């Protein structure tokens, strides 16, 4: 019997490469998305046929999973056998989050969202190479909550180039004010 089996699905596509990111990502190969997702589904089906255990956790990260149409991303998730109580997380860019996307994720079995906030200070976001603005963070959290997610986290980064202690304090205050279950 397996005590736990985690699955990580990497979506390597990004609108822009963040300056701090060391992951394998591409900003110029979005035309490969359909083929990449088909390859993922094929690989998962073969793994299941070879006695892949039920997943106790699934994390869909990147890259930027939210660049992939939500229904297509859920078609990949649907191939994974899930254990009862499995935590299924999708990493999300605040620029991309919509209520419809979050509702599609919920209906597809996602039960946790990870929002890449990084900072709520404009010049810090720019130094990190992020494209969203602080206002998108509040809107994103509202969409996540409205879609019924009780579990979500806000990722933040400390020590970005040019970030002051006041900037960091502002980000912490802003994030705490949003009352996320996890940071």
List PLM regions with ranges.
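Flexible, acidic/Gly-rich N-terminal and inter-domain linker regions that tether
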Residues: 1-5, 15, 42
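N-terminal [4Fe-4S]-dependent radical SAM core
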Residues: 1-8, 51-54
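Structural motif
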Residues: 4-6, 18, 87
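Residues at the beta-strand->loop junction immediately N-terminal to the Walker
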Residues: 8-10, 61-62
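Local cysteine-cluster metal-coordination motifs and their immediate loop/turn environment
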Residues: 10-25
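Conserved non-cysteine loop/helix-boundary elements of the Radical SAM core domain that shape
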Residues: 25-183
């Amino acid at each position: 019997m397996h005590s736990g089996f985690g699955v990580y699905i990497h979506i390597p596509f990004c609108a822009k490469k963040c300056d701090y990111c060391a992951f394998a990502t591409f900003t110029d190969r979005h035309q490969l998305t359909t083929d990449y997702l088909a390859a993922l589904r094929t690989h998962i089906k073969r793994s299941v046929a070879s006695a892949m255990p039920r997943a106790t956790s699934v994390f869909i990260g990147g890259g930027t999973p939210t660049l992939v149409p939500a229904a297509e991303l859920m078609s990949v998730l649907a191939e994974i056998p899930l254990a009862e109580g499995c935590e299924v997380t999708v990493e999300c860019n605040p620029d991309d989050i919509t209520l419809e996307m979050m509702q599609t994720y919920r209906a597809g079995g996602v039960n946790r969202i990870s929002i890449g906030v990084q900072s709520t200070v404009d010049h810090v976001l720019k130094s990190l190479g992020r494209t969203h603005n602080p206002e998108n963070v509040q809107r994103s959290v509202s969409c996540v909550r409205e879609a019924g997610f009780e579990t979500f986290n806000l990722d933040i980064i400390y020590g970005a180039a040019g970030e002051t202690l006041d900037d960091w304090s502002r980000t912490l205050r802003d994030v705490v004010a949003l009352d996320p279950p996890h940071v």
